[in-house]
Each structure stands twice: as structure tokens, then as C-alpha cells.
């Protein structure tokens, strides 16, 4: 039985997220697969990561890229077989890498056996596995909309009922009020733990306690009661790393999710910092420039509130987000500098860092000429909706370039060979044309690459407990160009100092710290005086005080 979260292995760990469809194809069908991941484990071992978060590989109609699961205990054939999955667990274990499964417990696919049964009649034993409301066709139970647009209710004429779906119409919500549903889910999780899973990322977990009649979707009244039961019945029976995805989390709520007593999760994914370059009250497509002062205050708040009372996840990229080097950096002239600066800013903080595939290469957003080249359901829906509202196509495309989930889903760039070494066949989605100069082969041959910088950052975290335990203090809070902070424990005080601009900036802090030891910096040669060059980052430490 695991007792609390005090000195857990995952506090020192670095996690690497794989989106299997776009990572590595092994059989030439143009779709990344599990054997492809196995073939690249040595690359990940070299990077230095401890765990892989694997986006869903369960059997699925792929209406929402595998987040619509039709069988939790089978593997989607395009990714491989259960034998492949077992081999992945075994091969990763040999290299000291754990596999975190991506769990979707809020909804299933409408092709899941439970839902097919549930639709047969109101008396079917599976009917109450989902959320139904009586009604008349065309008169919705209420005006709630789904996350992907359109009503959150779908009419089933045979039953004279609507079912509730917070996401796509092919993703009916599970009824967590039903203890049978919860038991089925717990048994499935225990089955995966037995197979060799080392942890779980819980998709939209803050939505499970919804109360549609009250229009409550996230943080419903029974949420934490359900989560404590989930943890008690499953994760606490093994040494799992668990992270809950909670778009609506505040630091106070996150304390509950990541309570050091281990009663819910190891940590939470919060998105407050990720929303700062979006117009307030508007959609994610309505972008504004990042205000660095706001970013600093936001991250400092999370660092300080969760210090000794919870645990942070540190991330800037995932399969839903645009590439950070294009978003908050400079993906042209200063691509390497800004990619490594952003990494330094993040990895110096307290929490468990997550690296999304290709982030360690400084992979960038993509700009396809036509909407026809895009795949993502959310992007295509938005294009259609905004055209109808009278937006100009060029204007909509600019939003897509900045924000589409497809930015993260172009195939991994392994080499300068055709299709970036991702596949010998026709890729399911086009590779970013810049693969000829941004790729893993090139990075591994250049000792000053983004890859080796990440490797160094990871090693620093492993060797210096101040990264795990040090107290955070934000410096220069009102400075619009420099993000600087210290981390301090009983033996070490370290300064993380980064320049968020493409200009030279003078930073008086560097005069005060000039006697310290430089642990890492993202320029090859030393600075002059207290000047930070464009997107420069440095970590300086005093030890043994």
C-alpha cells in the first residue's frame, strides 16, 4: 500500500509524451505504431526520461484521435496488438522507463459494447451506464453545448430519450453516479496495472461528476469523493504516477488533487498559464501577445501555493497545444535559443516536467496552405463556423496557424530522409516541410543542439535536490522582458534567469551572482557583464551555504 506522496520517485522524474499515431511507423502503412515506439526507446533512454505518457492506444473508431474508446482492454489494430503492448512494457522496463497509460473515464465511444446495449431499451442493465433524459425530438433537455460545438444532447428515437455528451456525439458521457460503472472502470485499471502500466494520465477527469440538470460540467459536487474512491480502489495498490487533466483547476483545487497524503493523484495538469495569450472571454482562436508579467505571476502563484501542499506538472506542449517555440519563442532566427530558454524557465521550477515528442528537437508549428490539408475535427469545425459568421478565410487560417491541435500532430522528424524518417509509406498526415533541417539525426550529431540541452537539463535535475525541494521566489516581477527566479534549499541557492525577447537586455541580478557556478547556459560562449543576449538562459548556483 503506498503511503502518501512524500518521497516519491516521480518527484525526480521527467516524463515524455508520445502521440503514437505521429511518432514512428514500423510497417509502412503511414501510421505510427507500438513497434515503432519500441524501436525508438534507446533514443528516449539517451535523452534521460523516466516515463512515457502514451496517448490512447485502445481500440477506437478514432472519431477523436483515440479518446473515443470502444474497448478499454484491447489495442487499436492500427497501433499493433496486445503482444506488442506487452513487449513495450517489457522493453521499457529493461531501460528503466515506465509507461503511463492515457485513461478516458468520462466517456466511451458510442461503439462501446456498453453503449450498444444501453441503446436497446430503458430496461437494459447497461442503460444506466450513461446519462439519459426523457424528452421530445428537437426540444433539448437544456441549452448546454458540447466542447466541440453544437448541442450536448443527442436524440435516440427508439427510446424517446436524449443522451448527454460533453464532447463529440460519438462520445457519450458515462454515469459516474452508478456504482457498477465505477466498479467496471476500477477493475479495468487494475487489469492494466497487472499488465505492467506504471501510471496513468486521466483525461478531462474534472468532468466526471457532471450534473447536466444544473449545467455543471467540471468540479461537480461529488468530484473529490469519486476521485478518492478511484485512487483507493486502484492507484494506491501500486507505486503509480498519476496526473489528472483539469482545465478548470485553481491552485486551491489542485491542492486537493495532489494532496501529499496521496488520496487522489500525484499531480494535476492545470492550464491557467496556457490561456494567457487568449483574449479574455473569447475562444482559443482569438489570440493576443503573451504578457510576460502575467505569465510570471501565474506560474509563481502555482509554485508558491503548491509548495509542500501539493505537486505541479510542468508543461508547455502536448497533443492539443501549438508548439511552444512558435508560440512564445522565435521559431526562425532564434529557434534554438528560444527553445532552450523556454525549457530552462520551465525545468528550473518545482514539479514533474513533461516533454512532448519533438519538443526536444525544437519542432515548430506548421502552416499548410489550405484547410483541406488539416485533419483535426476541432479545427475543421471552427473553420466552417467562422466562415458562416462572415470571417475572411485568410483571417481564419491565421488562427489555425497559431492554435490548431494539428500543429502538435505532424509526424515526428527523425531524419532528413523522405517523410522525415517517420514512415516508408504515405504518412497519415503531412510532415512539416522543415524536417530537412530540424530532425533527430541532425540534433544527435550537433553537440549544441536543443536535444543535448534537454539532456543536460534532465541530468541537472537528477543530480541536484534543489530542483525537487527548493523553495521558489520570483524576482523582478514587473520586468516585461526578463523571467528570473531563485530556488533555495538548505544546501543550495540557484538562480534561473531568462530573456524572453530577441534583443539584448541588461540584468543587474547577474552582477550579484557573478561569483556563482554556472550550471547551464544556452549560448556557447560567456556573456559580457550583465547583458543577456536574445533568448539567453542561464542557471547559476551557490552551494554549501
Region spans (language model):
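Active-site and adjacent substrate-binding regions of carbohydrate-active enzymes
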Residues: 2-545
Amino acid at each position: 500500500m503506498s503511503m502518501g506522496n512524500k518521497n516519491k520517485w516521480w518527484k525526480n522524474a521527467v516524463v515524455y509524451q508520445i502521440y503514437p499515431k505521429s511518432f514512428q511507423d514500423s510497417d509502412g502503412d503511414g501510421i505510427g505504431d507500438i513497434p515503432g515506439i519500441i524501436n525508438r526507446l534507446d533514443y528516449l533512454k539517451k535523452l534521460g526520461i523516466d516515463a512515457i505518457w502514451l496517448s490512447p492506444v485502445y481500440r477506437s473508431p478514432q472519431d477523436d484521435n483515440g479518446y473515443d474508446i470502444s474497448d478499454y482492454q484491447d489495442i487499436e489494430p492500427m497501433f499493433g496488438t496486445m503482444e506488442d503492448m506487452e513487449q513495450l512494457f517489457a522493453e521499457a522496463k529493461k531501460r528503466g522507463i515506465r509507461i503511463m497509460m492515457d485513461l478516458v473515464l468520462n466517456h466511451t465511444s458510442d461503439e462501446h459494447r456498453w453503449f450498444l446495449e444501453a441503446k436497446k431499451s430503458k430496461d437494459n442493465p447497461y442503460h444506466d451506464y450513461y446519462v439519459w433524459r426523457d424528452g421530445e425530438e428537437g426540444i433539448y433537455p437544456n441549452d448546454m453545448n458540447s466542447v466541440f460545438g453544437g448541442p450536448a444532447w443527442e436524440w435516440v428515437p427508439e427510446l424517446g430519450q436524449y443522451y448527454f455528451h460533453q464532447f463529440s456525439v460519438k462520445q457519450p458521457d458515462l454515469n459516474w453516479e452508478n456504482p457498477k460503472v465505477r466498479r467496471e472502470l476500477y477493475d479495468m485499471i487494475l487489469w492494466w496495472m497487472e499488465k505492467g502500466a506504471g501510471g496513468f494520465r486521466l483525461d478531462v477527469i474534472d468532468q466526471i461528476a457532471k450534473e447536466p440538470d444544473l449545467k455543471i460540467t467540471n468540479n461537480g459536487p461529488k468530484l473529490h469523493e469519486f476521485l478518492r474512491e478511484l485512487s483507493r480502489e486502484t492507484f494506491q495498490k501500486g507505486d503509480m504516477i498519476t496526473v489528472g487533466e483539469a482545465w478548470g483547476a485553481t491552485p486551491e483545487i489542485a491542492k486537493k488533487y495532489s494532496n501529499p497524503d496521496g488520496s487522489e493523484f500525484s499531480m494535476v495538469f492545470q492550464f491557467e498559464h496556457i490561456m494567457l495569450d487568449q483574449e479574455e472571454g473569447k475562444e482559443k482562436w482569438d489570440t493576443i501577445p503573451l504578457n510576460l508579467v502575467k505569465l510570471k505571476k501565474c506560474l509563481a502563484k502555482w509554485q508558491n501555493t503548491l509548495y509542500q501542499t501539493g505537486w505541479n506538472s510542468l508543461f508547455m506542449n502536448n497533443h492539443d497545444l501549438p508548439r511552444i517555440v512558435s508560440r512564445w519563442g522565435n521559431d526562425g532566427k532564434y529557434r534554438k535559443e528560444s527553445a532552450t530558454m523556454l525549457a530552462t524557465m520551465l525545468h528550473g521550477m518545482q514539479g514533474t516536467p513533461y516533454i512532448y515528442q519533438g519538443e526536444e528537437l525544437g519542432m515548430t508549428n506548421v502552416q499548410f496552405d489550405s484547410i483541406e490539408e488539416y485533419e483535426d475535427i476541432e479545427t475543421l469545425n471552427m473553420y466552417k463556423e467562422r466562415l458562416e459568421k462572415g470571417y475572411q478565410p485568410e483571417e481564419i487560417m491565421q488562427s489555425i496557424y497559431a492554435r490548431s491541435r494539428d500543429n502538435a500532430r505532424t509526424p515526428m522528424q527523425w531524419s532528413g530522409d523522405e517523410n522525415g524518417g517517420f514512415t516508408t509509406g504515405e504518412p497519415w498526415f503531412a510532415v512539416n516541410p522543415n524536417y530537412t533541417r530540424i530532425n533527430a539525426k541532425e540534433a544527435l550529431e550537433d553537440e549544441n543542439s536543443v536535444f543535448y540541452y534537454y539532456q543536460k537539463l534532465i541530468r541537472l535535475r537528477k543530480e541536484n535536490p534543489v530542483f525537487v525541494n527548493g523553495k521558489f521566489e520570483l524576482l523582478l516581477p514587473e520586468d516585461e522582458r526578463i523571467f528570473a527566479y531563485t530556488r533555495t534549499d538548505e544546501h543550495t541557492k540557484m538562480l534561473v534567469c531568462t530573456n524572453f525577447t530577441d534583443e539584448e537586455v541588461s540584468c543587474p541580478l547577474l552582477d550579484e551572482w557573478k561569483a556563482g557556478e554556472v550550471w547551464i547556459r544556452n549560448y556557447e560562449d560567456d556573456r559580457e557583464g550583465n547583458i543577456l543576449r536574445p533568448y539567453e538562459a542561464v542557471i547559476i548556483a551557490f552551494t554549501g551555504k
